[in-house]
Every structure is written in C-alpha cells, then in structure tokens.
Amino acid sequence: MKSTILFFLALFLASNNPLHSQSTNQLIHHNRNIEFRNPPAFNPDWAPFFHGVASGDPLEDRVIIWTRLTPEDMENGPFELSWRMATDPQLENIIQTGNTQTNADKDFTVKVDVEGLAAGTTYYYGFTYNGKHSLTGRTKTSPGVNEVDQLKFGVVSCSNYQAGYFNAYHRLADRNDLDAIIHLGDYIYEYADGVYGNEGLFTERKLEPTKEIVTLEEYRTRYSTYRLDTNLIRAHQQSPFITVWDDHETANNSYKDGAQNHTEGAEGSWVDRKSAAKQAYFEWIPIRERASKQVFRSIKYGNLVDLIMLDTRLEGREEQLDDVTSDAINDTTRTILGADQKQWLLENLANSTAQWKVIGQQVVFSAFNVGWTSLASSTPGGYYEIESLFLDIWDGYPQERTQILDHIRENEIDNVVILTGDFHTSFAFDVADEPIDVSLQADPTFGMIPVHSSNDNYNAETGEGAVAVEFATPSITSANFDENGGLTLATILQAQINNTIQPNPDLNIGNPNPHMKYVNLIKHGYFILDLTAEHAQADWFYSDILTPSSDEVFAQAWKTHDQDNHLSESNEPSPPKTMQSLPAPPNPLGLVNDIEDIDSPRSFALLGLYPNPFTTINYLHYSLTQSAHVRISLFDVTGKRIRLLQDQKVNKGIYSLQTDASKLAKGIYFYQIQIDDQLYQAKVIRE
C-alpha cells in the first residue's frame, strides 16, 4: 500500500505520546459530542444490597457467590445474613441454604464457596438480611471431567468508568448461553477523577475518591463506585466471572516491585499499596480466596478445555525496560511470570488432556512490530525509539516467550489458544517465534529503515510454523488508538499494520506483521470464545460507549481448527447453544415493578465509612439518586456538635466527604446526615 511522508511524520509525532501507557500528569481528552444523561447512582429498591450479586471461579462441584451488604448505620458488625441456592429463577427448588457473616473488616462484602453442586449445571442464588432480599443471581458450574460438546465464554478487559458507558456488559448480560465471562484485567482504574477518560462524561460519571487511589479505603471506595454501575451489576448477576488483575487494579504499568504510576515515599511504599490493592480486589471480586493472594490458577471444563489463568503483572514480572537496544532484553533469565509460575504453566500445558489449552493473560503475547512508523523521522534511532515504547508487552520479555513456545513445539502440544486484554484493541494472531525478519537498511530519502522479510520460522500463507493462536479483546470503554492519536491516524495505521508497506514506488519494506490476521484499533466491545471439538472461534462484537445503548454489531470471526494451530477466517459468528438457561429476574424476590404507597422514596445511601476506627482522616462515602440539600455534622457522645462538615445543595451522584479529625480527642463520634427532611446517623471511633 502506498502512503506519504506526511502520514509517517504524523504517526511518529503521535507515537511520542505513548499510545497505551497513560500517566496521571496529563489530562487525556476524548473530544466527542455526547448526549448528556444522568442515571441514578444506586437503586433504592435493592437496599441493603445496592451492589447486586455476583459469582465466580466455577468448579465442577462448587462456585463462589458474592454480595455486599450496606448497613444503614455503618456499624462495624458483625452482621448475619442467609443465602440459598436453587435450580430455578424463583428460588423455589432450593438445594442448599446457609448463614454467613460480614463486618467492616471485609468492607461488608460477602463470599460463600457453595460446595456439593452438580457438574455443568445452572443454578440461581440469593441473599437475605433482616427480611430483605438481594437480586437473584444466575451461575453455572464447570463440567468437570465430563464430556461436553460446546462451551461459550465472553472475554472482556479494560473498563474505564469515565471513558464511557459499560454497554458491552449490558449485552453480555442479555446472553443466555455463556458458561462464564473471562475478565482479563483493568477492571478498575486508579487515576484521579477527571484525569483519564472522556471529558464529556467527567460530570456524568464522577469518580470517588476524586484523588488517585493509594490506600485500602480508597481502593474499596473505587470498587464501590464501579460496582454501582447497573450494566456491570447485570453482567455479574447473569454469569459467573473468571478474573485476573492487570496493572490498573494497582497502578499503571505495574510489576512485582513497583509501577510507572507509583512514586515511592510520596505515595507511600509500593509494598503497602500493592497489599491494599490486592485485599480490595479479593473483597470485591468473586474470586476464590487464597492465603497467598495469587490469581494464577486453572479450571477444568470437561474434556474440552483446560482454562489456565496467568498473572503477568504482580507475581514475578521484572521491571519494564525503556530501551529495546539494551542487552538486558535478551537475558535468558529475564521474566514476566516468575520462576514458579512459569514452571507451573509449562507443567499444566504438558499434562493437560483437554482438547483445548486456553491461556487467559493480560498483555500482547505475539511479536508486535511498529518501528516502521518512524520512517519520516529525522531523529537518529527513531526505529528503536518507537519499538522501545512497547516493552510492557511480551516483546519486552522475548526469551521467556521463546522458552514457552519451544516447550509447546518440543512437546507437540496442539490447540493452544491465548487470550489477551490490556491493549484496547482487537487482534487475531498466528503465534510463532520470530515470525518475520527485520533488518535496518540505509535509504537516501528516509535514512535507516526497517525491512521486513519472511523466514523459515513461519509461512504467512499456510500458517506453517505457528504453534498457537492469540485472540485479543477490545476494551469495554478504555481509550483506543483513535482516542489517543486521532481517528484518521488510527484508521491509516489499522490499514497498514499488517499489510505490505510501500512509502514510495521504489521502496517496499514488506509486511511488518504477517502473522496478525485481524486488527481493529478503534472499536470497543468484547469477543465470544466458542469452543467445540472442531474449532476454537472468536466472534468480535462492538458497541458505542458515548451514550447508553443496547445496540451492538458483529464485526468479524476468526477460528483455528482442531490441531491446525493457525487461524482461518469464519464467514459468520458461531451459532448460539441449542440449550439456553432462563435469565435471573430483574428485581429481588417479592419486589414488583410498580411499587405503591411509598410516600418518601429513599434517595440516600451511606455506602461506607473508611476507616473505622480511624486515627486522623475518615471518609464518608455516600450516594444520592436525586438532587438534595445535604447537611452533615459531627457530634460527640454528649450530643454536642463538634463540626459542620457540609451544608449545601448536592446533585445526584456518588460522593466521598473527607474529615480531618487529627485534633479531636480519642473516643466515639457520630455523623448526623440530613438529606432534605430525611435524617440518618452513623457512629465512628477515633483511636
């Protein structure tokens, strides 16, 4: 394809603002016109289970069920509630019940590992506290060792609250044939309010806390904010999730011992921040508890799939390099997994008897060649400068990637499918070790240029040499290439990144990424992974993020046939399952759509008091479903008002009020919260 010097110059200039690595010292705008909307911050009819229900980590005989209780007075507890599991949406055919407790130490979250279940079975569950019922959730156990003909998974990643509406979650909730939703990380983002997202939504989708999150209380509050999104609630309600974290659950471009977006000292210690982020994750996500707080694990889906979930962030990753010419990049001991996890992965691959070995992980695994975009640059070393921007992915750890691919090849392991998130793009790759040769040559017009040529490792026409395939899911909402570099630039890059590039009639630099069979750098959404005895197929679906919408479009489908280990295009999405489960009902048990005889519908919810007890700073986290006059005071045990904290008109939304009580005496205090004519009270203790 022909292009112009102007294109290469523009692309190079744009690349100086890293297309994926974000930093909180820069305001990133998405300048698109949007229709202003303002949905409720919580559903008062769901009290005290405002955050809905969820399930996760299904095994053949058990599954995690989750909820969050929101006590009206935010006492520390403990609070006792009951749960039940049934085979019908009305929760009439109950097969198990039990009681459990929660308290402030768990941020009032609840997890139950329900055992003794039947394999490959759809169940419905719910919680009750003080006579009030939660939403009913739907979940499904894995088939275990049993034979299974077809599996379907929704695959998602990168849901930035302020970048757009979670419409893709809504569409996944509408599906009745999913075995689970696989979330590959960046479930939340750590940035301060108004820093990273769509500026037209900063008011509409306000973040709490408003600052960058660092402490346990701040991570908890951010999860609480996300989990009040109705689309996310519905997705969790209707399908079990299987999750791993990526970097933004802690901080941007994190690794074992630090992160690009962490300043040691000024933001506390990385050890403390990482520990707080992990604790909040395990509290708010329906993942099975492990004392080690590790997230790499495997789940068997019958004879068809072994699902192997990896942690390429916090478990063992060494710090990212910033120079592709560094000798360290080819150090054979350099690791993104850590020694223990890598050995565990290799053993799982070698010992698997399942037809498909599906690896869920975070960052792009395949070789990703982008240095050619520097052709118009007069900067010495422009090729290396561009390539050095993309070392957070497996390209920054090439020797470990080679070791894994050698293991697959030498052990003749077929049907390996790699699932990838993180990059905010859709990709389908044939996975081969060094699928293209790159050499730098002198050119009188462009200076040093990369020339790409085929080699014996991989044949792009036949797929020979590939040992696996990789499917990358787009972001739910997080910024794509067009939102970082402009739509025109992204469209041109999308058209050229895996095609022959000819800057002028006399210069052909070849195809930099012939193993990349599908690319979309612009759209948001998810893909459905469909697995049968014949194929593993990814179907990409895209939806708008700038307005609430239930619309979506099917884009493309790519698949690998049994033992092919390379991709071919499919003409249509995989068909739905013939047997589909009934959806969980939209309202809690006993609640109908038309509620009568309510004189003063609830408009306020106290979502958290962090921490309690506290020493200096306390946060009051609350939500309004409508605008109201808010008056919040702090009283001591004698009834004397110590401080008026807030007295103003407040729009509906989610808020956190910070109180510095460092000069107060130790003891018991009470918040008095007046919302128009409604009065609430909450006790806190200063130690």
Give residue ranges: language-model regions.
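Bacterial N-terminal signal peptides
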Residues: 6-15
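Short strand-edge motifs at loop-to-beta-strand transitions and within beta-strands
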Residues: 108-112, 653-659
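C-terminal tail/sorting-segment detector
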Residues: 21, 135-138, 643-644, 648-649, ...
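Glycine-centered coil/turn sites that cap beta-strands in beta-rich domains
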Residues: 67, 422, 594-634, 656-662, ...
